[in-house]
Amino acid sequence: MFVDLSDKKIVVVGGGNIATRRIKTLLQFTRNITAVAPKTTMELHELGKAGFVDLINRPVKRSDFVMAFMVIAATNDWKLNDEIYRVCKEQGIYVNVADDKSKCDFYFPGIYMQAEVVVGITASGLNHKKARRVRVAIQEAMEASDNEE
């Protein structure tokens, strides 16, 4: 299932490598992203500085989730991630706890985009390497098909 995220508020809690990767994936589909973290990667800092992400450099507050469609908890604090999960479930917000598959309402597929075609591949969070191999195979097939035209 693909969801139009263009007008949906997305909150990412965390500023490390996983949060940065998730944000870069989401930026392919929306610019309505808020990242909340006391510290961030340099890449995420630059995305905020360039205006691609609303970057809030402080610990997360419950009020950060007001009107959120989805929240990604990508901190290195499992207690905080668990609290984020609990708050989101109470408020009916889709949530993804990056390091706990059992606390994910959605997964991040491997994405391949070419012109108007978007392909998403997931192994339901179970086998990332296999999903990546399938994405590469699809990418190679799509590129070969384009070369034939």
Identify the function of each model-found stretch.
Residues D4, Y112-E149:
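Adenosine-phosphate binding glycine-rich loop
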Residues E46-V66:
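Glycine-rich, highly charged phosphate/nucleotide-binding loops
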Residues M70-T75, N81-Y107:
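ADP-ribose/adenylate-binding Rossmann-like module
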Residues M1-R22, K130, E149:
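Glycine-rich adenosine-cofactor-binding loop
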Residues I33, L55, Y94-V95:
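Hydrophobic beta-strand scaffold residues
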Residues N17-I18, W78-K79, G125:
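Residue-level detector of alpha-helix initiation sites
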Residues R21, F29-L47:
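NAD(P)-binding Rossmann-fold cofactor-contacting core
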Residues A37, L55-P59, D99:
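Short loop/edge segments at beta-strand edges and connector loops
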